Amino acid sequence: MRLHHLLLAVLFLVLSAGSGFTQRVRNPQSCRWNMGVCIPFLCRVGMRQIGTCFGPRVPCCRR
């Protein structure tokens, strides 16, 4: 019975951890929380866009 509870807890942990990666970054606070930085117009070389900060013209970029 203890093994059943352990497996259930592991399953819950795996499923809850993956749910955050499917949501897009849409504001400056969530950009910083996802290790990103708000840069006007375009992301710098070596960085990729992971969302937006204030609108479509300000992307959230991360290395």
From Swiss-Prot:
<comment type="function">
    <text>Has bactericidal activity. Active against E.coli ML35 and S.aureus 502A.</text>
</comment>
<keyword id="KW-0873">Pyrrolidone carboxylic acid</keyword>
<feature type="modified residue" description="Pyrrolidone carboxylic acid">
    <location>
        <position position="23"/>
    </location>
</feature>
<dbReference type="InterPro" id="IPR001855">
    <property type="entry name" value="Defensin_beta-like"/>
</dbReference>
<keyword id="KW-0211">Defensin</keyword>
<protein>
    <recommendedName>
        <fullName>Beta-defensin 4</fullName>
    </recommendedName>
</protein>
<keyword id="KW-0732">Signal</keyword>
<feature type="disulfide bond">
    <location>
        <begin position="43"/>
        <end position="61"/>
    </location>
</feature>
<keyword id="KW-1015">Disulfide bond</keyword>
<dbReference type="GO" id="GO:0005615">
    <property type="term" value="C:extracellular space"/>
</dbReference>
<dbReference type="GO" id="GO:0042742">
    <property type="term" value="P:defense response to bacterium"/>
</dbReference>
<dbReference type="GO" id="GO:0031731">
    <property type="term" value="F:CCR6 chemokine receptor binding"/>
</dbReference>
<feature type="disulfide bond">
    <location>
        <begin position="38"/>
        <end position="53"/>
    </location>
</feature>
<dbReference type="GO" id="GO:0060326">
    <property type="term" value="P:cell chemotaxis"/>
</dbReference>
<dbReference type="Pfam" id="PF00711">
    <property type="entry name" value="Defensin_beta"/>
</dbReference>
<comment type="similarity">
    <text>Belongs to the beta-defensin family.</text>
</comment>
<keyword id="KW-0929">Antimicrobial</keyword>
<keyword id="KW-0964">Secreted</keyword>
<dbReference type="GO" id="GO:0042056">
    <property type="term" value="F:chemoattractant activity"/>
</dbReference>
<feature type="disulfide bond">
    <location>
        <begin position="31"/>
        <end position="60"/>
    </location>
</feature>
<keyword id="KW-0044">Antibiotic</keyword>
<feature type="signal peptide">
    <location>
        <begin position="1"/>
        <end position="22"/>
    </location>
</feature>
<dbReference type="InterPro" id="IPR006080">
    <property type="entry name" value="Beta/alpha-defensin_C"/>
</dbReference>
